[in-house]
C-alpha cells in the first residue's frame, strides 16, 4: 500500500508533541503535492475527521522520555502552545521556565526541580484518552510487534499510528508508503545545542514509582506496547 492508493486530499500530522512528528512533516511535505498540516490540537483532529479524504498521522512514545524532551523543547516559549485538549479548554499549555540561553548555564539539579514544578506532567494521558474518544479505534487491536498501523475510518479517512521507538525498524515501510527516499529525523537531541545538558538531566533525574505508574500503567500504554516494553520503560529511570 502507498499513500496514493488512499485517494486522500490532505494529511494532518496530529500528535502529543515530541514523538518525531516534525520528522514526518519535513519528510513528507516536499513530495506530497496536497495539503499537509502539523498540529497538536485535538479540536483540529475532531474537525478534520468530520470531513472526508484525510490521512491522520499520530505517534506515541514512552511518556517519561517524552516529558523530558517536551520540557527542553518548550521551556523558553512565553505563550501557550498548540497542545490543545478538552482538559485545557483547547487553550494549549504554558510551559515557560527561562530563555533557552539561560538553560545552558543553569545547574542541572536546579533544572530538575524546575521540571517537577510545572503542571503538565500527565497531560499526555489527557491527550490520548480524548484521542481514543475521537477516533474510536480502541476495539481494533494494534500490532505491538510491528509498531505501525493504518486504520480505515468513516468518510474515506485513514489513521496511521506509529510507535516512536520502532521508527527505525519501520523505515522501509514509511519510505515506501510516502514515496520518499529518506526519512529525516529532525529535532534529534544528539545534534541540539543543549545535548550535553539534556543527557546529564536524564542521567540525574529520579522519577518515583507513583510518577512512572501514572504514566505507564494505563490503558493507553497497554494498547500500544507489550508488557515487556512497559516494564523496560519503568526500569529506564531510577
Q: Where in the sequence are the language-model features?
A:
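Membrane-interface amphipathic segments in extracytoplasmic regions
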Residues: 1-238
Amino acid at each position: 500500500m502507498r499513500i496514493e492508493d488512499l485517494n486522500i486530499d490532505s494529511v494532518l500530522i496530529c500528535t502529543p508533541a515530541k514523538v518525531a512528528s516534525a520528522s514526518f512533516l519535513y519528510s513528507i511535505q516536499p513530495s506530497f503535492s496536497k495539503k499537509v498540516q502539523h498540529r497538536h490540537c485535538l479540536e483540529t483532529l475532531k474537525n478534520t475527521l468530520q470531513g472526508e479524504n484525510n490521512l491522520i498521522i499520530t505517534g506515541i512514545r514512552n511518556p517519561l522520555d517524552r516529558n523530558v524532551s517536551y520540557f527542553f523543547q518548550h521551556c523558553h516559549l512565553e505563550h501557550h502552545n498548540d497542545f490543545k485538549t478538552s482538559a485545557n479548554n483547547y487553550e494549549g499549555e504554558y510551559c515557560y521556565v527561562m530563555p533557552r540561553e539561560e538553560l545552558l548555564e543553569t545547574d542541572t539539579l536546579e533544572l530538575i526541580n524546575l521540571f517537577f514544578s510545572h503542571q503538565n506532567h500527565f497531560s499526555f494521558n489527557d491527550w490520548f484518552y480524548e484521542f481514543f474518544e475521537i477516533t474510536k479505534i480502541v476495539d481494533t487491536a494494534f500490532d505491538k510487534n510491528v509498531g505501525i498501523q493504518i486504520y480505515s475510518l468513516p468518510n474515506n479517512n485513514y489513521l496511521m499510528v506509529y510507535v516512536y521507538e520502532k521508527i527505525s525498524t519501520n523505515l522501509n515501510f514509511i519510505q515506501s508508503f510516502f514515496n520518499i527516499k529518506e526519512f529525516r529525523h529532525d529535532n534529534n537531541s544528539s545534534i541540539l545545542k543543549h545535548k550535553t545538558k539534556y543527557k546529564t538531566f536524564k542521567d540525574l533525574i529520579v522519577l518515583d514509582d507513583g510518577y512512572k505508574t501514572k504514566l505507564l500503567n494505563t490503558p493507553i500504554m497497554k494498547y500500544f506496547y507489550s508488557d515487556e516494553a512497559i516494564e523496560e520503560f519503568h526500569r529506564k529511570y531510577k
